[in-house]
Every structure is written in structure tokens, then in C-alpha cells.
């Protein structure tokens, strides 16, 4: 069974759907980056790469994992 792990600066959340993990990440990024121009750039990168950065520091990412049934 596959699932998606959303890592946010030290905490981890698990989702069965990539879409749900990406949407939750987007909601969090919208709160973190209030400037519209910066927010749009970060969110576009998020949907393309499944990673988010603040400067050079990675603040969020999604990985695809497999679990034995």
C-alpha cells in the first residue's frame, strides 16, 4: 500500500492521497508567506516539486512511501 509523507520542519503527517497532502501543504504555505508575490512563487514550486524552501532552508516536502500489507 502506498502513502504520502508530508514533512513540515520536524513534524510528519501521512496521507493516502497525493492531492490531499499537496493541498494541506498549500494551506500551510499560504499562512507562512503572507506576501502575495512570494506566496505565489512558493506555491507554484510546491505543486511542481513537492518541496518548499524559505531562503536556502527546506521547510516542507512530500515523499512517496510504501507499506507492507
Task: Describe the role of every protein-language-model region.
Residues 14-36:
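Short, flexible N-terminal segments of the mature chain
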Residues 30-69:
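Short, mixed-charge low-complexity intrinsically disordered segments
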Residues 7-8, 19, 42:
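Intrinsic structural disorder/low-complexity segments
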Residues 1, 16-23, 64-69:
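A short, sequence-level motif marking secondary-structure junctions
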Residues 1-12:
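Short aromatic-glycine-(Arg/Gly/Cys) micro-motifs in beta-strand/loop hairpins
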Amino acid at each position: 500500500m502506498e502513502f504520502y509523507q508530508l514533512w513540515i520542519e520536524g513534524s510528519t503527517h501521512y496521507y493516502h492521497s497525493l492531492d490531499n497532502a499537496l493541498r494541506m501543504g498549500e494551506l500551510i504555505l499560504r499562512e507562512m508567506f503572507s506576501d502575495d508575490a512570494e506566496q505565489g512563487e512558493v506555491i507554484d514550486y510546491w505543486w511542481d516539486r513537492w518541496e518548499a524552501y524559505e531562503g536556502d532552508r527546506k521547510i516542507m516536502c512530500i515523499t512517496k512511501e510504501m507499506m507492507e500489507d
